[in-house]
Each structure stands twice: as structure tokens, then as C-alpha cells.
């Protein structure tokens, strides 16, 4: 049953992609994704493992092999590929960004991240779903985030965290929307989860 107007914040429409944030009545972290093939993973999000090759000198890891896997399929012919890195201090929250056109490809290279994903796509079967994915040094995964999926993170632990990411187009501020970390409709619990 579609959400009522009072339960939705419209975020815009472009290229047949309509986005809206659905009110979440209970503060939570949504579905925690523990396996790349989880049935709760938001549709269109892809997770792949990163293999580290350690030896006595350190380790080597391939971050992306463009066009060689499901995660990077189609990027080999991309004329506007951009590679960036973000470094964040412990406890930093970079709240939700979303795009109408841009696809993000993330791989952590240092530290640990609590990644938050929210399906903002009105026509998605998972509209309103929220995922939490812990990734980084202790869970080396690559992540593909399609247009219409809000994404953000919190750095967990005591170390600086670094994220390398590809985008399938150059940064365009007109393609990006943002939601504050404490948005009442998102109702995400950023606090440590004591169990």
C-alpha cells in the first residue's frame, strides 16, 4: 500500500527517477547486511569482496578491475570516470547524499565504516528500506550504490578511515541532494548499538 502524503518527503524527479523519503516510525539501523547476497540488500546495490595478498612486506589488494565483474560492468567504456578519496576522523558522520544520475563505487582502504543506505526510489519494490553495512579493514568489501539510493556513513573505531570511490561521471552539484543525519523521517539510530 503506498505511503500517504504525510508520510513522504518528495525529493525530486529526473529522467523518470522519482525520489522521496518515507517516514520510518521507529528509530533503528534497518537491516544489517552480513553477506553480499543478503535478501535484504537494497535492489541494485552490489557487494563484492576485496582480496588482500599479504606477505612479509605488507599486502597488495586490487581495489577495482573495471569491467571485469558484475559490480563494474559497463564502466570500461565510461568517458567520465572519476576516482576520489575521502578521509574522515573517528566518529565523523557524513549523512545521506543521493543522486539522480551518478552511480558510486566504494572501497574502504583504512579504518571501519558504518555505511547507511536508504532506498529513495518511489517505484522500487524496496522503497523506504534501510540497510546498515559495516565495512573496512575487518570486512573488505566493494560496494556499488545506484542512483536513487541515499548513502552515508559513520566512522567507527579509533582510527582515521579512508574511502576510495569511483563515480561514473564527473561531480555535478546539481545531481546531488542531501539529507541531514538527524532527519526525523529517516529516524536512523547513529548511536552505538549495545546488545
Model-derived features: where do they sit?
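Non-catalytic, conserved peripheral segments adjacent to functional cores
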Residues: 2-138, 158-195
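Conserved metal-binding segment of the jelly-roll/cupin
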Residues: 135-158
Amino acid at each position: 500500500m503506498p505511503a500517504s502524503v504525510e508520510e513522504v518527503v518528495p525529493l525530486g524527479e529526473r529522467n523518470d527517477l522519482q525520489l522521496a523519503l518515507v517516514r520510518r516510525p521507529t528509530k533503528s539501523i534497518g537491516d544489517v547486511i552480513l553477506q553480499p547476497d543478503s535478501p535484504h540488500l537494497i535492489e541494485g546495490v552490489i557487494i563484492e569482496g576485496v582480496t588482500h595478498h599479504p606477505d612479509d612486506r605488507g599486502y597488495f589488494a586490487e581495489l577495482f578491475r573495471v569491467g571485469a565483474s558484475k559490480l563494474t560492468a559497463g564502466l570500461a567504456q565510461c568517458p567520465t570516470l572519476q576516482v576520489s578519496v575521502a578521509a574522515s576522523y573517528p566518529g565523523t558522520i557524513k549523512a545521506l547524499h543521493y543522486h539522480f544520475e551518478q552511480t558510486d563505487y566504494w572501497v574502504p582502504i583504512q579504518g571501519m565504516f558504518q555505511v547507511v543506505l536508504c532506498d529513495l526510489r518511489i517505484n522500487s519494490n524496496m522503497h523506504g528500506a534501510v540497510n546498515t553495512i559495516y565495512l573496512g579493514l575487518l570486512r573488505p568489501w566493494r560496494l556499488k550504490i545506484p542512483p536513487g539510493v541515499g548513502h552515508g556513513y559513520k566512522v567507527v573505531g579509533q582510527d582515521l578511515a579512508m574511502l576510495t570511490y569511483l563515480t561514473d561521471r564527473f561531480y555535478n552539484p546539481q545531481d546531488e541532494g542531501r539529507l541531514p543525519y538527524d532527519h526525523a523521517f529517516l529516524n536512523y539510530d547513529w548511536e552505538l548499538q549495545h546488545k
